[in-house]
Amino acid sequence: SLRKMHALGET
């Protein structure tokens, strides 16, 4: 769940 929003933040 949170991995999805964190995915774009993991640039």
Swiss-Prot record:
Disulfide links within the chain: none
Keyword Metal-binding attributed: no
GO biological process: proteolysis
One GO cellular component term noted in the UniProt record for this chain: extracellular region
Keyword Membrane: no
Keywords associated with the record: Aspartyl protease, Hydrolase, Protease, Secreted
Organism domain of life: Eukaryota
UniProt GO MF annotations: aspartic-type endopeptidase activity
Primary site of residence: secreted
Cell compartments where the protein resides: Secreted, Extracellular space
Family affiliation: Belongs to the peptidase A1 family.
Summary of the tissues where the protein is detected: Expressed in placenta, specifically the maternal caruncula tissue (MCT) (at protein level).
Name of the molecule in the record: Pregnancy-associated glycoprotein 56D
